[in-house]
Design a protein with these regions (language model features):
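Active-site-adjacent loops and short helices of periplasmic peptidoglycan-processing enzymes
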Residues: 19-175
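Bacterial N-terminal signal peptides
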Residues: 5-15
Length: 175
């Protein structure tokens, strides 16, 4: 008539022990020269591989261009309905842009800041980045200086821009 707890303990104790054990998966196999995964809530680095390796940012450069455009609008120095003059340098037929992503803008044809913003973000238009860079800073070179100042203020100490679009340049690098 005695009831033994032994069978229940044999089943229950391992289950409780497993429930309290955090299962941490091994890092995924990623075919990349560099990566970094950070927990959004805690800021803890979950997995990394060569996080300080400088690589060409390519079209990720356009994120900084679009960010500066948005900042200029937020500060009231630029309006989305402003008309931009497209230079021959920003023209889609510029040989620098051959074979690259374009918005297909032309000199002498009116284009608004909003259209250029869409051309940068949606079409990844290299011509659109130069047009907005020239409109904001007077020249692409002056805009690149602005990009590098923003990068420094953001703590992107190993990022250096050489153009507004991300086409290859040996010194156009980021981590």
């Amino acid at each position: 008539r005695y009831w033994s707890a032994w069978p229940f303990g044999a089943v229950l104790l391992p289950s409780v022990a497993l429930a309290n054990t955090a299962l941490v998966p091994s890092p995924p196999s990623i075919n990349a020269d560099s990566y970094l995964l950070v927990d959004f809530d805690t800021g803890a680095v979950l997995v990394e591989h060569n996080p300080d390796l400088q690589l060409p940012p390519a079209s990720l450069t356009k994120l900084m261009t679009a960010y500066i455009l948005a900042e200029e609008v937020a500060l009231g120095r630029l309006a989305l309905d402003d008309t931009v003059r497209v230079s021959r340098n920003a023209w889609s037929q510029n040989p620098v842009f051959k074979g690259s992503s374009l918005m297909w803008i032309e000199p002498g044809k009116p284009v608004t800041v909003a259209e250029l913003e869409r051309g940068i973000v949606i079409s990844s238009g290299n011509d659109a980045t130069v047009a907005i860079a020239e409109h904001i800073a007077g020249s692409e070179a002056a805009f690149v200086d602005l990009m590098n100042r923003y990068a420094e203020e953001m703590g992107l100490t190993r990022t250096h821009f050489e153009n507004s679009h991300g086409l290859p340049h040996p010194d156009h690098l980021s981590t």
